[in-house]
Amino acid sequence: MPSAKPLFCLATLAGAALAAPAPSRATDFNKRSTCTFTDAATASESKTSCSDIVLKDITVPAGETLNLKDLNDGTTVTFEGTTTWEYEEWDGPLLRISGKDITVTQSSDAVLNGNGAKWWDGEGTNGGKTKPKFFYAHDLDDSKISGLYIKNTPVQAISVESDNLVIEDVTIDNSDGDSEGGHNTDGFDISESTYITITGATVKNQGDCVAINSGENIYFSGGTCSGGHGLSIGSVGGRDDNTVKNVTFIDSTVSDSENGVRIKTVYDATGTVEDITYSNIQLSGISDYGIVIEQDYENGDPTGTPSNGVTISDVTLEDITGSVDSDAVEIYILCGDGSCTDWTMSGIDITGGETSSDCENVPSGASCSQ
């Protein structure tokens, strides 16, 4: 600590000369400094002592959160090396970051490794081991997450509950879960959020690439999704917030997945899905549905019986092209009586599968055939 005394003395002398402003400048100096942390406890305890936080080769103890909640405004968080989490059955999250005007990024070779294989048992959140969610980006407002490489999350990767958050060039690689029992490894789960922009994401998983449960003004562009359940809205209904409004999925690919484009709402619930656009979505290797919109979910599964309490309106499906498996359905629409309105479909060219004869209450402007 040889440098502490000179700094203290300088601050004291400045205080003698300039009175009250000196402590303010000392505080500003501390906030401008860079802190490098190599253990989770110190990072969590000292996170507000500086405005540039470097997390280097941290191993987070079992059952603990790498907690970067309530950071100072304007803080930058940089991951270096490999960040890992030790095994314990619990709900998580493994990582939590919140604050305003925060930048979260990493060095070029960094990895956030959730060690998901230790939890994977083919059950996901439906049973078996209790699995922690990975990253809560909650109350991370007016902020940016850029360039993260996330590998092997136990279940859902990034949970978003924020306002004005940009997520760019993030990779979520749960491809090991294809053969090791990964399930419900959603890429991005979005709820109670406004103005969320996700660009250039790569998601390899066994769950939704994106699932929007509630929120407004959400934009997903340039995504590459494989192995999972597709680009999803819902299930909508039965939550505190049951509105999804002004959502765009554009210029993205979905491959080797159960679904391409999906909107699902909860049976006998209420809510609103409004002003939705899927544009220029390319599909390949889809096993279940190219496009599926249904209003019959109950206890997490479709029932075949729709209800009309959640309305789905102002939907644009355009330039959705590609192929599905031979036993997959190209387009399936199951709406309640009068609850689906003002839809337009154009440039739909999905090949290789079956045409559904079970669609119900298909709104004007849409069709289950091409």
Curated annotation (Swiss-Prot):
One of its GO terms (cellular component) is extracellular region. InterPro entries: Glyco_hydro_28 (IPR000743), Glycosyl_hydrlase_28 (IPR050434), PbH1 (IPR006626), Pectin_lyas_fold (IPR012334), Pectin_lyase_fold/virulence (IPR011050). The keyword Transmembrane does not apply. Glycans are attached at residue 246. The active site is at residue 229. It catalyses: (1,4-alpha-D-galacturonosyl)n+m + H2O = (1,4-alpha-D-galacturonosyl)n + (1,4-alpha-D-galacturonosyl)m. Residues 20-32 form a propeptide. It is found in: Secreted. GO terms for molecular function: polygalacturonase activity. Optimum temperature is 50 degrees Celsius. Keywords: Cell wall biogenesis/degradation, Disulfide bond, Glycoprotein, Glycosidase, Hydrolase, Repeat, Secreted, Signal, Zymogen. PbH1 repeats lie at residues 162-192, 193-214, 215-235, 244-265, 273-295, 307-352. Disulfide bonds join 35-50, 209-225, 335-340, 359-368. It comes from the Eukaryota. Optimum pH is 2.0. Its EC number is 3.2.1.15. It is an enzyme of class 3 (hydrolase). Residues 1-19 form the signal peptide. One of its GO terms (biological process) is cell wall organization. Involved in maceration and soft-rotting of plant tissue. Hydrolyzes the 1,4-alpha glycosidic bonds of de-esterified pectate in the smooth region of the plant cell wall. This is Endopolygalacturonase A. It comes from Aspergillus awamori. The gene is pgaA.
